């Protein structure tokens, strides 16, 4: 199903422990500290994220599509 940038942001922050670092315009930078270092991703707050954009965000955030889809 289609997901908005805002929904994606909520899931990554609430379920995967990311914190909002800053926002510039419609783009939000999130980060998380792990034992392997920092992980970050940029999320555009669009009404509807395209599949490639969502996959790229999940890849940057090191979150599997299966884990993410449990919360959608």
Predicted regions and their residues:
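Basic nucleic-acid-binding interfaces
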Residues: 1-23, 29-72
């Amino acid at each position: 199903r289609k997901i908005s940038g805002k929904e994606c942001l909520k899931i990554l922050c609430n379920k995967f422990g990311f914190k909002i670092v800053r926002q510039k315009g419609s783009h939000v930078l999130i980060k998380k500290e792990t034992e392997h270092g920092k992980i970050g991703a940029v999320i555009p707050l669009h009404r509807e994220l395209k599949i490639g954009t969502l996959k790229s965000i999940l890849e940057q955030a090191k979150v599997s599509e299966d884990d993410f889809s449990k919360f959608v």
